[in-house]
Structures are given as C-alpha cells and as structure tokens.
Amino acid sequence: EIKPSYNITPSQDVLVYDGKLHYMKWAYNPYWSKKKLNLINCRIETMSQKPSFKKAERCVFLLNGWYEWKRENNEKQPYYFTNYKLFFMGGLKNNNGCCIVTKQAKGELSLIHHRQPVILKFHEINNWLTGSHSFQTKIDNEIKILKVSKKVNNTANNTKDNIVKKK
C-alpha cells in the first residue's frame, strides 16, 4: 500500500523502484562499515570512486517534491521543490538502505542550494537502473520553488499544509 507523506526525513521509509516497487530506509550504510553512517546523499561526480558505494545498486525514488533550507536573515527558511506531478530521482541502495544521488544545482535551484537530486523522466528510469545514461535531463527547468512554512521542521507535521506556498 502506498501511503502519502508530506514530511519524510532521513531514516524513514521511502518509496523506491529497483525492478519492483517497495519501501526502503532512507539511510545508506556501506556493507563494510562497523558503525552506522546513515548516508542520505551521494555525489554523482564521485559515486564510482567512493568505497562506500562500490557495491551499491541503483534505485529510483518516487516523489512529488523535496525540501531544501536556505539561510535568510539569520534563520533557516524551508522551500519545497516540485513540478506538481510524480517524478523520479536517481538513488543508490544496498540491503541496509538507500540514498539520493545529487549533482551540481542549476538555474533557479542553485539560488537555494548548491546541490540537487539527479531528476529523471519516466523514460529514463531503465537507463538509470542499468547505468547507461549521462542524465542531462531538461526536467530541472520544470521544477517550481515554493517558500513554505517552517512547520516542516517538525516531523510530526505531516500534512498537505506543508506544501502550500507561504504568503
């Protein structure tokens, strides 16, 4: 059963696809690590060289948007990034969990944060899973950025109100 969520945080279960649709813990731990690293992101530029990801498999996160915070007037302000549709992010996984693959942010997205997820279109999913694509998708231009309430800082607030544009 797919459950809507409006405030997923690291270490919670996220919906992923890796040939089948299922939930996984959003916190990646290398198979060799004796202590929990709980990695939530991986840079696409270095993922093939980092020992942490040597045996990782690819997966795809399914979502409608994500949050980033920007420091404004000495406070952190949350923003919601969306295209108002289901979209997909490149990820890595193992038996211990999963993480989002990021790249250098482009355009308006870079005004909020210097990194962004690798965003995929539906027809790119199989190429991502097989590792045969450079992922220069134009979907980045379709992402809208909404200033939202600071209520998202509390994981107990998990309602549609979180993704309403702040006035």
Describe the residue ranges of each PLM region.
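Short linear sequence motif anchored by a di-proline
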Residues: 1-167
